[in-house]
Curated annotation (Swiss-Prot):
Keywords: Cell membrane, Membrane, SH3 domain, Stress response, Transmembrane, Transmembrane helix. This is High osmolarity signaling protein SHO1. It comes from Fusarium vanettenii (strain ATCC MYA-4622 / CBS 123669 / FGSC 9596 / NRRL 45880 / 77-13-4) (Fusarium solani subsp. pisi). SMART domains: SH3. Residues 40-52, 103-111 are extracellular. The keyword Transport does not apply. Coiled coil: none annotated. It is a multi-pass membrane protein. It holds the Pfam family SH3_1. The gene is SHO1. It is found in: Cell membrane. Belongs to the SHO1 family.
Length: 295
């Protein structure tokens, strides 16, 4: 439930080396830029006024840093990564414009501010690549593997249905294949009346043989053995995968399994969106492929 989402926890920042390093560098770069902009504003002259656009870039950069801190601290990267990527893309433009305005100047304060903007731009580019990448991509999975805090297990189910444009395939073979007939059996099956329909089947003047209609129209009383049985799990698991996020199985589906972040699973087939996996304790079931990365 959305109401049960946790608040900001510093463990999500301190336990993630990538988040801690980039946020620290970004905050340091912003402090350099902000102090240098203040000094540059004080040292401005009538012939060389301080560009006011730099203040907007400085304020926007602070909003980006705070936003990234809140998203990572609240463990909601999976939910807001698209919005964060859009804001970061706009930040690259603003910060780059600030560099262009301040770099080519004789003032040391303005050059220091431009250096801070350059450092901010580098961090924003890295953030854009991180938040804009799929969680199962190799670079992002590598960075997430160093995080100590576990990803929240309350991720909305719609993200799973939206992965690849489809949901999980059925895991039982209850669908019966269509019955095939020969040309001899279908001989005389033509309907002479354009509106006769099914009501004339088996009646007077019917073009369908009575013996054939009985065999076709009557449903089968029994299904083939094992029609509704569950799929037998495989005996070989040649692949090994590492969980990049925690996942909680659907309580209504006995085929799914739950696992925690960084847990190692054995996988039998990696061709679909849902993989047949086995945990270290011997528990087997299906797991979403975008939560795993092959080793």
């Amino acid at each position: 439930m959305y109401g049960g989402r946790k608040g900001i926890q510093m463990s999500n920042i301190l336990g993630d080396p990538f988040a801690l390093a980039t946020l620290s560098i970004a905050m340091l770069a912003w402090c350099i830029t902000f102090v240098a902009c203040i000094i540059g504003r004080i040292q401005q002259t009538n012939d060389s006024p301080f560009p006011t656009f730099a203040w907007w870039g400085c304020i926007y950069s602070l909003c980006l840093i705070v936003g990234v801190f809140v998203v990572i601290g609240s463990d909601s990267v999976h939910t807001y990564h698209v919005a964060v990527t859009g804001y970061l893309a706009a930040g690259i433009v603003l910060v780059s414009s600030g560099v262009n305005l301040l770099l080519y100047s004789d003032s040391g304060a303005r050059e220091a501010a431009s250096a801070g903007f350059i450092l901010l731009a580098m961090v924003i580019v890295i953030w854009t690549f991180y938040f804009g990448s799929n969680p199962s991509s190799t670079p992002r999975a590598f960075l997430d593997s160093f995080a100590l805090a576990k990803e929240s297990t309350t991720i909305h189910r719609s993200t799973m249905n939206g992965y690849g444009g489809g949901g999980r395939p059925e895991t039982s073979n209850s669908v019966q294949p269509p019955q095939m007939y020969t040309s001899a059996q279908l001989n005389g099956f033509e309907n002479p009346s354009p509106v006769g329909g099914v009501s004339q089947v088996g009646g007077r003047g019917s073009a369908v043989p009575q013996s054939f209609t009985n065999s076709v129209m009557q449903p089968k009383a029994t299904n083939s053995p094992g029609a509704d049985a569950e799929v037998v799990p495989p005996t070989e698991y040649p692949y090994r995968a590492k969980a990049i996020y925690s996942y909680e199985a659907n309580p209504d589906d006995a085929n799914e399994i739950s696992f925690s972040k960084h847990e190692i699973l054995e996988v039998s087939d990696v061709s679909g969106r849902w993989w047949q996996a086995r945990k270290e304790n011997g528990e087997t079931g299906i797991a979403p492929s975008n939560y795993l990365i092959l080793l």
